[in-house]
Regions:
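Active-/binding-site microenvironments in catalytic and ligand-binding cores
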Residues: 1-96
């Protein structure tokens, strides 16, 4: 399964992305969660991105259907206290 490595995270930060949309979880370590207790400090990519003010929208579907020429992403998360993430409804508007 895909994941972001540190080189990819550094590229995202260096190019000053404001948000990243993925169709997979960003950290490789997330794959260990069913097998063992995974500690917050192990989410190196997660912290690299968030510490630079970049948001993640992950586990999306059908990203290949977006042309990318003139696309607007609208993501509306549920309000949840004490979390750094939440379920959301995400819509891509492709302005041909």
């Amino acid at each position: 399964a895909p994941y972001l490595d540190l080189d990819a995270a550094n590229c995202i930060v260096e190019n000053k992305f404001i948000s990243v949309c993925l169709d997979f979880p960003q950290d490789y370590i997330a794959r260990e969660m069913p097998k063992r207790m995974v500690y917050n400090k192990e989410f190196e990519i997660h912290h690299k991105i968030f510490d630079n003010g970049i948001t993640f929208i992950e586990d999306l579907m059908n990203l290949g259907n977006i042309s990318g020429n003139d696309t607007q992403i609208c993501a509306v998360p549920l309000k949840m206290d004490c979390f750094d993430g939440a379920p959301m409804r995400t819509v891509a508007i492709d302005w041909y």
